[in-house]
């Protein structure tokens, strides 16, 4: 029984090859399929990202089986082209690729295979094996990125110039008002001082000999930090804030102060005197009335 079932190799089986030939004869393929391609000149690794993205769009989800199936057909064709002696003979038949993908993609198999084959033809004509479409897309992407970078630089430069102009106007107004009031030196003197301070900073940064006006010069400990080492704009902008203001001295009430009672309540002196005289007057009137009433009662008695 073991020798009853006998089979043949796939190359010797004529059933499927005949069916494929009949299907190829009955199917109408695009004219670009007739172009022969040398697969040794094609960079397959560049095409793989596009193949995966395009198949996901057509299927609607990520199907690794179909993606790896297409990768396998391309890699097999490249290996076959390396052993082939003829450079004009194509080792990858796009018609077979379309028929193999019909079961997965159905009506989208023709569109996908035609796009893939056009990219393969373009890659074979390039010295780096990259399709011309990919090169143009990359150049366009680089150009857009460059435009965005330049736009951001221009925007930042505009903002910086605007802030510098506003700061310059503010300082100019402040300096002019100070000069009119005679509280500071002229702007030319200040600019010269700033120039010397900047020169000292550059010399100290690169390790040159320190300036006599530098904050790191050899001075006593109490005089080591020169006033010009601090930010002059910050100092001049906020120097008026710490000036003593002309305030009226606050008076704290005590019991010994005149015009306040023992509870700290203040009363006007005139009001107090008038109030006192009023009370004294009425007290005298009350005493007189009481004395008259007492005398009347005595007379009546």
Swiss-Prot record:
GO function terms (MF aspect): RNA binding
One GO BP annotation of this record: mRNA cis splicing, via spliceosome
InterPro entries, per the entry: PWI_dom, PWI_dom_sf, Ser/Arg_repetitive_matrix
Main location: nucleus
Domain of life: Eukaryota
Residue ranges with Basic and acidic residues bias: 145-182, 189-205, 215-229, 254-289
Keyword Magnesium appears in the UniProt entry: no
Disulfide bonds: none
Protein name listed in UniProt: PWI domain-containing protein C825.05c
Protein source organism: Schizosaccharomyces pombe (strain 972 / ATCC 24843) (Fission yeast)
